């Protein structure tokens, strides 16, 4: 991203950052964009905080537009003290002349600080669409399409679970206070200060809200392949015990009502997460290859049994004559069965031009009882031994006039 300078008609210099075609940015450009996003988010939070500061003392009256009737919205102060004021008068101290339920302040700045805390918290909640959009626009360019989809889905589910936890904490708060403030009411009477009461409520809300995110975290670990359903199934009882211990320690009031509500809700959510991991593992098992579950030092299974090979079809036609049989090498039309090859004959040596024909000698008289004529050997005879070709008509094994071919496997082939 580069920066360009332009001069307006009024003489004012404006600097606009040009975006690179490939979407890359330098570190300075990233810091500049981060500063812009933070300033926008802080400006929105500041405006909504002012609205929350005013809303702390003044509720929004009821109004109606045609058939639509909107009831009165109580002030933030009334919403904050509602769980405490729902207790019976015998469980809380009342120091006002009109016997109105109010929180106790023991320092000059306690009222102002409580109002600022409630206004800031309300402003943060009311401005959440703006600062969430700014965060999303800052991180979106660095994410792929599937990463954007997963981030948006996980963020939406996480926000819903946190809000569900906040609502559950607010509903459990009166019952928890009722149990805690009646444990020693015969000896003491409660007079809660605004600061301690606010800290107690915020702690309970955060515990419930963050605890409701544990099932989502478990499902994400399963999607990442860290944990599986079989592992969680074997440790289900241990998980339930751990959840009850966590609920007993994490709830700020240490009352059994808050502990039981938090523990039972977490058990139900964890069971839903377990069923999600079971379905996901079952679907993933259908697409897992045989070697994906093996470690690095294990060999993958091989299929040693060869598959059956079909018999080859004959390329010859029984009715077609080969070359040796007088058929054509290429049938008419350029297609058809390939002719059979002609049989291989024994090689013969043709006489060269320099060689002159040798007269055939007359056969020598023989004393053998067999009568008959004896033909002269050819000029070249194929022999087996030191000499491959014998051009002479000399003796063979001391018997002149007889040159024979020794029998061998090679002769049989020929």
Curated annotation (Swiss-Prot):
Record-annotated disulphide pairs: none
Biased composition (Gly residues): 323-336
Membrane-spanning segments: 45-65, 119-139, 157-177, 200-220, 238-258, 259-279
Principal location class: membrane
Region described as Disordered: 1-21, 315-414
HAMAP family, per the entry: TatC
Record-stated family: Belongs to the TatC family.
Protein name: Sec-independent protein translocase protein TatC
Organism for this UniProt entry: Corynebacterium kroppenstedtii (strain DSM 44385 / JCM 11950 / CIP 105744 / CCUG 35717)
């Amino acid at each position: 991203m580069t920066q360009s300078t332009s001069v307006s008609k009024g003489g004012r210099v404006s600097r606009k950052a040009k975006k690179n075609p490939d979407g890359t940015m330098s570190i300075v450009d990233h810091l500049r964009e981060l500063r812009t996003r933070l300033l926008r988010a802080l400006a929105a939070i500041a405006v909504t905080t002012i609205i929350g500061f005013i809303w702390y003392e003044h509720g929004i009256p009821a109004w109606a537009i045609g058939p639509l009737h909107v009831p009165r919205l109580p002030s933030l102060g009334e919403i904050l003290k509602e769980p405490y004021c729902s207790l019976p008068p015998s469980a809380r101290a009342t120091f006002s002349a009109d016997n109105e339920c109010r929180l106790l302040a023991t320092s000059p700045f306690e009222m102002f600080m409580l109002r600022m805390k409630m206004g800031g918290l309300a402003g943060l909640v009311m401005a959440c669409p703006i600062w969430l959009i700014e965060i999303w626009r800052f991180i979106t360019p660095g994410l792929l399409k599937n990463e954007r989809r997963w981030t948006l889905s996980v963020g939406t589910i996480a926000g819903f679970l946190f809000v569900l936890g906040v609502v559950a904490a607010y509903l459990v708060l009166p019952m928890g206070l009722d149990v805690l403030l009646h444990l020693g009411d015969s000896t003491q009477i409660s007079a809660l200060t605004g600061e301690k009461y606010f800290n107690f409520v915020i702690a309970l809300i955060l515990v419930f809200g963050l605890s409701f995110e544990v099932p989502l975290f478990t499902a994400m670990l399963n999607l990442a392949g860290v944990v599986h359903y079989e592992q969680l199934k074997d440790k289900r009882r241990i998980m339930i015990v751990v959840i009850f211990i966590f609920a007993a320690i994490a709830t700020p009031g240490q009352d059994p009502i808050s502990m039981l509500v938090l523990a039972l809700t977490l058990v139900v959510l964890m069971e839903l997460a377990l069923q999600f991991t079971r379905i996901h593992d079952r679907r993933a098992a259908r697409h897992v290859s045989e070697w994906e579950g093996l470690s690095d030092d294990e060999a993958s299974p091989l299929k040693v049994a060869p598959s059956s090979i079909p018999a080859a079809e004959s390329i010859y036609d029984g009715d077609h004559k080969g070359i040796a049989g007088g058929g054509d090498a290429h049938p008419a039309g350029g297609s058809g069965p390939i002719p059979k090859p002609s049989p291989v004959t024994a090689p013969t040596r043709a006489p060269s031009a320099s060689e002159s024909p040798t007269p055939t000698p007359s056969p020598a008289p023989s004393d053998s009882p067999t009568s008959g004529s004896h033909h002269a050997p050819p000029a070249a005879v194929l022999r087996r031994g030191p000499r491959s070709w014998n051009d002479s008509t000399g003796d063979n094994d001391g018997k002149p006039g007889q040159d024979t071919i020794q029998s061998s496997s090679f002769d049989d082939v020929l």
